Amino acid sequence: MSGHDRDCPASRRYAQGTSDTGGRAIYRLVLWNIDLTLVDVVRVSREAYAEAFRRVTGRPLVALPQLAGRSDSEIFFESLALNDVPSQRSSEGGQDMLARYIWELQVAFAARRELLTRNGRLLPGALEAAAATAGLPGALQSVVTGSIRPNAAEKLTAFGLAGYFDLDIGGYGADPYPRGSQLLRSVTAAQEKYRAPVAATVYLADSNRDVEAARIAGVRCIAIASGRSTVTDLRAAGADVVLTDLTDTAQVVEAADRLTAVPAAR
């Protein structure tokens, strides 16, 4: 348990693999992106991408595509194209290149676990915001992220965030679905796991692609200009609320509460 988790009752709310909510009624879902929304571990991620790519293709990763709003699966195929590597089935065990890459990426990232806090950082206000939104009445929290699930868990655990999210109902980078579909699948997963109707959902993220995915899925979006997209970009993309960062916890909570308010449940 990290020092962040030790004194936070909310961090013990989600026991992965169970549907225990402590007797709370669930009626709204708060979903978060991870990279450049909650944490910045780009340096470690790039190193892991390069190692996994080399192990699968036998070639160095010379060119890496833009990462914002993209899944690890998308990044792999775009990297193949950028580096002139043909996409084909591996001769080893009949596993395709993507399956091998996902495995190698997990291994490469786990090997760099100790570097996450050394070469990465928790973004300002992220811990407080995640803790506060987890405490909203009727709220259930998870992540919809481009990272594969093991790596998402590594990132959240390293910075004391993991306990605020039910990772079982999240959307991850190995899933063969666009981000908008992942958001909808998380809503369905939450309803099935907790046997409760989710009346409203909000997605907190940092890129234009994330905002567009939320609009496609029909969920509300709080965009945080902590990544590559500017406040102007995020507003133009159609975010319901745009924040410069997460440092004003009350502002984050007010926006999440307002966008997921269900009159009959308040």
Regions found by a protein language model. Give the residues of each.
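Metal-dependent phosphoesterase signature
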Residues: 81-132
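Substrate-recognition element of Asp-dependent hydrolases with the DxDx(T/V) motif
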Residues: 37, 49, 126-159, 172-177
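Conserved Lys-Pro-Asp/Glu-containing loop-to-beta segment of HAD-superfamily phosphomonoesterases
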Residues: 179-211
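Acidic, Mg2+-coordinating phosphoryl-transfer loop and its flanking beta/alpha structural elements
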Residues: 203-241
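Short acidic-hydrophobic, aromatic-tinged amphipathic segments that line or gate anion-handling sites
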Residues: 171, 241-246
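A short, structured active-site edge motif that brings together acidic residues
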Residues: 65-68, 95-99, 163-177
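Active-site neighborhood of HAD-like aspartate-dependent phosphohydrolases
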Residues: 14-68, 74-81
